[in-house]
Amino acid sequence: MSKDYFIGLMSGTSMDGVDAVLVQFSQGEATLVERHSQAIPKHTLSGLQRLCLPGSDEITRLGQLDRSVGLLFASAVNALLEKAGVSKEQVVAIGSHGQTVRHMPNLDMGFTLQIGDPNTIAVETGIDVIADFRRKDIALGGQGAPLVPAFHQQMFSKPDTNRIILNIGGISNVTYLPGNSQAVVGFDTGPGNTLIDAWIQQVKHEAYDKDGAWAASGETDEKLLMYLLSHSYFSMGFPKSTGRELFNQAWLEQQTAAFGHLSEADIQSTLLDVTCHSIAKDVLTLSADGELFVCGGGAFNRELMSRLHNLLPSYQIDSTASLGMNPQWVEGIAFAWLAMRHNQGLSGNLPAVTGASREAVLGSLFPAA
């Protein structure tokens, strides 16, 4: 029985579910064999959202959620294998990103923390797990993020063509793939779906703004837009990365407190423009024109995509589906790829992207045995 599959597990800052993908790699190409998305139970989601903000008794909650998320990830793997009709013996390793609960690389003693106990995943699935991908890069002086640009470079580069891969999850990040010999560049541009999700959850108790319809029904307030975009993160040079520690519901409430005269739909429209304008500014800083391919949940937001087209008329914009990779599963495939790189003793980071002092093999091995 051949053993040539890798599994990627990803749950992003939007916490909208666990993505599990079964992947085969051959001659530098990735084939998505099967995929599975598993919802995060409400009590686990509530605990994770609380843990992402300062509070009391965090260590006990952290320890328990670490196990709970590990069990959830393992359940996603087992469901994936059953759906694919593939046995655990055929899988080389699982690459698990985990669930980020803190990402603070710019402190004097910078750190990042993802939970979802890889020991639990290994025991519950019977498959070796490679996890903790980000902390080696931080130990080397880097941001620990974004890590997907190395994967984007291998899968999506095209000679003589400037390409940008834009991932819009909870946070948006870009990878610039120049068509010449320039170094690849990648960084977080700022909020992706996190603010528009937080606002619709607070006001309408809906998980997300389907197709951006609510935002489309409102009018952007230029004063609020400029106020939000004046945050220092948007003017920082790269490498840079961010997360829910900064752009969260508490921050949103504080920033919009003086704008109570606006309608709720107008605020939603303005928040969507924060995402789109911050992306467009950084994209144009990287290159005046080229091809832009979108992945992540934002690729399915019709209003968001329309606004990007309007802000970036010199770019050809499409989703990564046009490159043969479903935008929903790109990050999961990337962590299967990082597991494969670890297994082969190959580096997974790009120092030009993260600011690390050198390339390194990322992740730690947690054997099932």
From Swiss-Prot:
Protein name, as recorded: Anhydro-N-acetylmuramic acid kinase
Gene Ontology MF: a single term: kinase activity
Reaction(s) catalysed (UniProt annotation): 1,6-anhydro-N-acetyl-beta-muramate + ATP + H2O = N-acetyl-D-muramate 6-phosphate + ADP + H(+)
Record keyword Transmembrane present: no
GO BP term (any one): amino sugar metabolic process
NCBIfam families for the chain: PRK09585.1-3, PRK09585.3-2
InterPro entries: Anhydro_N_Ac-Mur_kinase (IPR005338), ATPase_NBD (IPR043129)
Record: residues binding ATP: 12-19
Pathway the protein takes part in: Amino-sugar metabolism; 1,6-anhydro-N-acetylmuramate degradation; Cell wall biogenesis; peptidoglycan recycling
Keyword vocabulary terms for this entry: ATP-binding, Carbohydrate metabolism, Kinase, Nucleotide-binding, Transferase
Alphabetical list of Pfam families matching this protein: AnmK
Role played: Catalyzes the specific phosphorylation of 1,6-anhydro-N-acetylmuramic acid (anhMurNAc) with the simultaneous cleavage of the 1,6-anhydro ring, generating MurNAc-6-P. Is required for the utilization of anhMurNAc either imported from the medium or derived from its own cell wall murein, and thus plays a role in cell wall recycling.
PANTHER family: ANHYDRO-N-ACETYLMURAMIC ACID KINASE (PTHR30605:SF0)
Similarity annotation: Belongs to the anhydro-N-acetylmuramic acid kinase family.
Organism phylogeny: Bacteria, Pseudomonadati, Pseudomonadota, Gammaproteobacteria, Alteromonadales
EC number: 2.7.1.170
